Amino acid sequence: MENFFYNIPTKVSFGKGAIDDLPGYISEYGDSVLLVYGGGSIKRTGLYDRIIKLLDCSHISHIELSGVEPNPRLTTVKKGVQMCLEHDVKVILPVGGGSTIDCSKAIAAGACYDGDPWDLVGHPEKIENAMPIIAVATMAATGSEMDPFAVITNEETKQKKDIASDLLY
């Protein structure tokens, strides 16, 4: 076996009732979130209602970016960036799987970049800052919650590329 060094600065809170700690994690960074989710399974399972109640009871304001598609689109990322800037969002809260988390990572970097988020593809040196992300992973299929990559799709060029930075863990 070859020697190696492995660094994952991701904090993981897991277990029964762990979701109840969510407001505490959010309040370390601010009192407003962009809640990002996909097709609505979090509503069908009751997770959405539970999270909204936790946010409301903790006086954490929230706006929503719903309908994040598999292979998140650049237009969705841009919409999220605009929402963060217009509403002075402090934390991004993706709830879902890899696509939701990837979209949120791209939003986190894009909201701190003065330009088109697509410019960040292949240019980690351009990512000088990123918004905090506190993810509620509902399925661990892609591992996005444990890596510094965000894969997004540019509908115009038909390209699927990644944005990468240690700031996106």
Identify the function of each model-found stretch.
Residues 1-29:
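N-terminal amphipathic/basic leader segments beginning at the initiator methionine
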Residues 34-35, 91-93, 134:
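Conserved beta-strand elements of the Class I
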Residues 10, 20, 112-169:
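A glycine/threonine-rich phosphate-anchoring loop and its flanking beta-alpha core
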Residues 24, 34-54:
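Glycine-rich phosphate/diphosphate-binding loop of Rossmann-like nucleotide-binding domains
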Residues 37-39, 67, 136-138:
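Cofactor-binding loop segments of dinucleotide-utilizing enzymes, especially the Rossmann-like FAD-
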Residues 30-31, 89:
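Short, high-confidence coil segments that cap the C-terminus of an alpha-helix
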Residues 46-115, 119, 124-125:
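N-terminal small/polar loop signature for handling phosphorylated ligands or for N-terminal nucleophile
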